[in-house]
Design a protein with these regions (language model features):
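Helix N-cap/beta->alpha junction signal
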Residues: 69, 229-231
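Short, surface-exposed acidic/glycine-rich loop or hinge patches that mediate macromolecular interfaces
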Residues: 47-50, 82, 111, 148, ...
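Phosphate-binding loop of NTP-binding sites
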Residues: 88-229
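A short acidic, amphipathic alpha-helical/loop segment
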Residues: 54-58, 181-182, 232
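N-terminal leader/targeting and accessory segments in enzymes
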Residues: 1-90
Length: 232
């Protein structure tokens, strides 16, 4: 999908003051060095075991590089942005003109029942869904790569749904996605909590950490919260 170009400063302004000499017009954003073009902003974040800049080579095309410090010997002209991995969703939302502001988004979290409930909600509302079953409307589902996609892809999907005239989106919000800030930049209309049982403790270490990750969905102001209090 084609987006109007945005100034680099408008995308990064909340996190840093950009040198006027570094201003650029940005036509695309990515976290993947294989998707770079001459008008692309490369958001080079730190991962679990590698930093995106580990894959930098001088011949990579990019309008600008924003990277998450610390990183030894970043490329000349690369812009340090503290906690970049936590801001990816917000940056993507600004690039795509805040699509969640035009949508009623229902976020569903919990150990069990997310996929079924999101599918039922998409059926009931005639809207789109994002989850394990797929991404899109029920008559045109795209295969899912993750329960909750990466933050840039989420915002791209939401912008597509907005531009197609869709008004409601039901999405699975996994504990991994919440812990990794993948749903940053999304204004949820409704938050739903299905249940909590032992799962993903290889990632969350204990039940308290797992619960706190799920609870992040409800940390933002929600017009409506639906919480299952009897899972018998």
């Amino acid at each position: 999908m084609s987006q109007p170009k945005k100034s680099l400063s408008s995308l990064l302004a909340p996190y840093l003051t950009l040198d006027p000499a570094a201003e650029r017009m940005i036509g695309a954003i990515t976290t993947d060095n294989r998707q770079l073009d001459a008008d692309t902003l490369w958001l080079a974040a730190r991962g679990v075991s590698h930093h995106a800049l580990d894959y930098y080579t001088p011949d990579l095309p990019a309008a600008a590089i924003a990277y998450e410090p610390p990183y030894a010997n970043p490329p000349a002209g690369a812009i340090p942005c503290e906690c970049l991995s936590e801001h990816l969703g917000d940056i993507a939302a600004r690039f795509y003109d805040d699509p969640s502001q035009a949508l009623d988004i229902i976020g569903v979290t919990g150990t069990d029942g997310k996929s079924s409930l999101v599918h039922f909600l998409a059926q009931a509302t005639g809207g789109a869904m994002l989850g394990t079953i797929g991404y899109g409307t029920l008559d045109a589902l795209e295969a899912a790569s993750h329960t909750t996609p990466d933050p840039l892809r989420i915002q791209q999907h939401l912008a597509q749904y907005r531009d197609a005239g869709i008004t409601t989106v039901a999405m699975e919000v996994s504990s991994h996605a919440l812990a990794q800030h993948r749903v940053g930049g999304i204004r949820f209309r409704i938050g739903v909590f299905t249940n909590l049982s032992r799962d993903h403790l290889d990632y969350h270490h204990d039940m308290e950490d797992y619960f706190l990750a799920k609870a992040r969905l409800f940390a933002q102001p929600l017009p409506v919260a639906v919480i299952n209090i009897d899972d018998a």
